[in-house]
Regions:
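Conserved loop->alpha-helix
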Residues: 1-188
Length: 188
């Protein structure tokens, strides 16, 4: 389980068909054990090993086909360590199970150093106005869901601490819908 509060941004490199290396700069990752879960762009991956500020993960064909963790996408990824019983939950409960990907439709910089990011290609039956959504592992609040689109308002702090700063229109992002919304929809 994760909180959607990003610890660091890493640089993704493909070492082989099923192995990725992520270079990071933050000390949060210096004392990890092999087998630890790490959210990479919101996708829960198991740490194979690490050395010299580099995390190594094995990735399945399923992960490569269902997420934006692939050689054709942006090489900057958001990283988060799993929550513990003492973790301050300042985002929302994130499982690290990517539901689908969406496209960045438009990015709008506002006058007050804030941004609106518009996304399309989502299943809005799991999205409500002011509800939680996870985009590339980031806990965010939905604005104006309609048809297969919605947008989020991004403050400077979130923009600077995440890979949102590297996104451009047409890029693919990972989406995890709110777990409670998925359970409610299943009960219908």
């Amino acid at each position: 389980m994760f909180t959607g509060i990003i610890s660091d941004i890493g640089k993704l490199e493909f070492n082989s068909e099923d192995e990725i290396h992520i270079t990071y700069s933050n000390n949060h990752f210096s004392n990890l054990e092999e087998g630890t879960s790490v959210a990479v762009n919101g996708c829960c991956l198991t740490l194979r090993n690490y050395e010299n500020n580099k995390l190594v993960f094995q990735v399945s064909t399923e992960t490569l086909s269902k997420t934006n963790i692939n050689p054709n996408n942006n090489n900057y990824v958001n990283l988060e360590l799993p929550a513990t019983l003492t973790t301050f939950l300042s985002g929302h409960i994130v499982q690290g199970h990517v539901d689908n990907t969406a496209l960045v439709d438009r990015i709008e910089q506002l006058d007050n150093d804030m941004w609106n990011f518009y996304f399309k290609g989502v299943d809005t039956k799991y999205i409500i106005q002011k509800g939680s959504i996870t985009i590339n592992g980031i806990s965010l609040t939905v604005v104006d869901p309609e048809d297969d689109k919605f947008h989020v308002a991004i403050i400077t702090e979130t923009y600077n601490r995440t890979n949102l700063q590297y996104l451009k229109e047409g890029d693919t992002v990972n989406i995890e819908y709110d777990m409670i919304a998925k359970y409610i929809e299943k009960q219908k």
